[in-house]
């Protein structure tokens, strides 16, 4: 699972200039051979490790690196 976690973090870092939040389906594309439930477990583990954070608009939940993006800057998060 550590290798999969690193793959997610590398993906997010490579996109940090354009986007800071991503849909769940963006991550399922990273792991085409895995079931959605397995991908969800990887993302949940990263959230629990405080590497990722959830962001919700009320109707949609997205994932991003903790402290990245305009929302974090507006809330003065580190």
UniProtKB/Swiss-Prot annotation:
Name recorded for this polypeptide: Protein DsvD
Short name of any one Pfam family annotated for the protein: DsrD
Gene3D superfamilies in alphabetical order: Winged helix-like DNA-binding domain superfamily/Winged helix DNA-binding domain (1.10.10.10)
Family: To A.fulgidus DsrD.
Entry-linked InterPro entries: DsrD, WH-like_DNA-bd_sf, WH_DNA-bd_sf
Domain of life: Bacteria
Function: May play an essential role in dissimilatory sulfite reduction.
Signal peptide: none
